[in-house]
């Protein structure tokens, strides 16, 4: 069985995921700005309900972004480890 690793593709995946993470952050910031303006016009229980939902949304989104960051680190670490292993194996055969 032959295993071949395409390290540039793995790095490309890491870069794509990091880009997604940045886009999520930017969209969240835009969303927050718009919603802050809207929230200022609400009073009473509507404002409280909105605040509760917004906090939950923020927590969930932060969780997703954190998981995405963990995935980026795991893929990056795996690619580095595989590359080091492959270099070590190649050096055994090339002297």
From Swiss-Prot:
GO cellular component, one term: extracellular region
Keyword Secreted carried by entry: yes
Keywords in alphabetical order: Secreted, Virulence
Main location: secreted
UniProt superkingdom: Bacteria
Keyword Secreted: yes
Pfam family of the protein (one): WXG100
Entry's localization field: Secreted
Membership in a protein family: Belongs to the WXG100 family. ESAT-6 subfamily.
Function: A secreted protein that might play a role in virulence.
Subunit structure: Forms a tight 1:1 complex with EsxB.
UniProt-recorded name of the protein: 6 kDa early secretory antigenic target homolog
């Amino acid at each position: 069985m032959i295993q071949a690793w395409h390290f540039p593709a793995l790095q490309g995946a890491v870069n794509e995921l990091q880009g997604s993470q940045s886009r999520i952050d930017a969209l969240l910031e835009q969303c927050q700005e718009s919603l802050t303006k809207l929230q200022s016009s609400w009073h009473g229980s509507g404002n409280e309900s909105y605040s509760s939902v917004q906090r939950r949304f923020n927590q969930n989104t932060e969780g997703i972004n954190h998981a995405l960051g963990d995935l980026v680190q795991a893929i990056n670490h795996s690619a580095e480890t595989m590359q080091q292993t492959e270099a070590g194996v190649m050096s055994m055969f090339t002297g």
